[in-house]
Amino acid sequence: LQIGENKLTAHFLLQTKFIRWDPVNGSGEFNIKALYVKILFFDIIIPYDDIAANFDIECIVKYPNEISILTSDESLDPSILIKLPQGKILSIYLLTSLILAAIIFTVILFLSENHRKLKKLHTRLSTKIYDERAFFKKLPLLISIACLFWIFSLTGYSISIDDELAIFRQDHSLWIGQGRWAVFLLTEFILPQPIIPFLPHFIFCVSVSVSYLILVRAHGMELSWKNIALFPIFMAFPTWYFIAGFYANILAVSMGLIFTSITLLIFSHSLSKINEWKILDKTFFLLIFIQAFILSIAIGCYQSYIFCFLSMGLGIILLKVDQNSSISNRYIIRSLGYLFLIVCASLLLYYSTDFTFKFIYGVSSNTYISGFINLEALLKFPGDVIVSTLHEAKQIYLGSSKIFGVSLGAIGCLLLTGVILSLYSASNWKVRATLLILMFGCIISPFALTILGGGTRSIPYRSMVGVPYVIWFFSALAIERKNTVITFLITTSLIISSFQIMNAHSNYSAVKQLTLERDKALAAEIYYRITTLIPGNDKLSSYKVDFFGSKPFNNIFPRIATSTIGGSFFDWDGGNPDRIVTFMKVIGFDNINTIDSGQRRELVGFYDEMPVWPSVDSIKMVDTVFLVKLGERPGLMHQFKEQ
């Protein structure tokens, strides 16, 4: 147990009647607020009357909303007994078995009734996949290229801000509160501990390679040497690195990218019959539902994929117009309406599923996602918000070093070349006007959340997952032109941009690694200094520690404004004792704990007379608490309002 609120889980067999819990090694007092057995979606509350003393327990006091347990003064291994509600558990198991049996029976009945149709569908799908075998033979090559660009992330292990909390997380329902129910499913059933080296990044390398194959196919292109050369721009763009800075995001983002690409493939192929469908056509509604269902899963992985798909969909329509200047306005309008319906239907399915998960698991929405939305700023200053968003978009698409820390100017040349060549090759001004409108929509869609958030830097750069697609798409438009000079210039720009992207990865990896090494060394030195102050007759097995202020780490490598890359655990939030202590536990100093806010308020005055680290007296022992002063300015947790 740590000081503060703890949520603990334990697994047991069906026939278990009692559980013995040994909460602490030594004496102490603790309160239980809630105790329940969780089976699938059901929470069976264990009444306080079913909690009894077992060994070294002085007394148990039961209150309406909690139960207080006090151990004996000389206790070494106190324990309590918890009686499990076996009758209710067996009832839930029986009900679940009946529901599963009903589902299995329904599936078998459906398969038997639709056997011939399903067999035809299976044959068609098998033929399609077989026809694409030559295309997918290049998948190992793409995976190899991806692994080359992500080599440091694959071979290293550099945790950053928030990873320290995720390592100890046992309850993954936090993701449901953020509206990322697909992340909850992936973390709960596939990768319960996502903060590990190699595997998450390797999954991303495979996923981004598969997604790229699907993406190229959705645009009706072949995987020629040109599109292979374009792959690094899509796969290694810094946006992905910013997301991968948090290990817990990687699996969900990888799966979300695949689902988004599959939705785009269906959308692209179905556009050929857009003029033939009627509004009440069953096939039309079925296609809408299938695409909305797949895309809703992608949104459940990472909400920004809705804007990514919107950008991709506009790109597909733009490509159709670029390739066929005689295309009718009716086709364009119907295509845009079709895209709009898919987006709306996917959002409807996403929010319905989100509501269902929150209802089943009893989780309410937290303020993390909603905190990014600032409609008040948009309504009060719409002009300023739009202008600042356009300015930020310009800096990102031109590869400004102010955004990425290093220059990525070559990608800006690729994007501008694609735009200019597409407009130049248009047959008349009407086509150019149509292309220009579609281009603007495609380019600005990844920044829709920035507009809703109130403008520049209101949204982390990692959320702009549509940007790599936009740059790849316009680069592909340029390189597909059958002109030797243009091909040479684009190829040269590609080589330069690939080098610049690899340089960006190298710089980000350097700042992450150096910051982590400094934090580890600082943690070890602080722990050593604490141990020198421990009295010789001390028998405590753990120690209370509080940190005041921050100790920033400044180096020559770039820091990204909205990213945790290079963020120090001793500097975040102006110095956050909970983060610092949790980080120290991760690297092995597991016998230290933080203090609660009440005790922190009582002790904050002692910091006034203490010098700043690394002075000799920058660590002080007050009663049983070690106070560590890292800086002069109080962090968020030491900024108490005067009463």
Language-model features, listed with the residues they occupy:
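Membrane-interface micro-motifs in multi-pass membrane enzymes
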Residues: 176, 180, 204, 225-269, ...
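Membrane-interface alpha helices of multi-pass inner-membrane proteins
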Residues: 285-303, 308-314, 345
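Membrane-lumen/periplasm interface segments of multi-pass, membrane-embedded glycan/lipid transferases
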Residues: 145, 158-195, 336, 340-422
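Signature aromatic-anchored transmembrane alpha helix within multi-pass, membrane-resident enzymes
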Residues: 282-288, 411-413, 479-503
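Membrane-embedded, lumen/periplasm-facing catalytic core of multi-pass transferases
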Residues: 496-565
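Perimembrane helix-loop-helix junctions
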Residues: 308-344
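Hydrophobic, aromatic-rich transmembrane alpha-helices
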Residues: 103-111, 115, 210-212, 394, ...
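Transmembrane-helix motifs of polytopic, lipid-linked glycan transferases
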Residues: 202-229, 262-266, 417-422
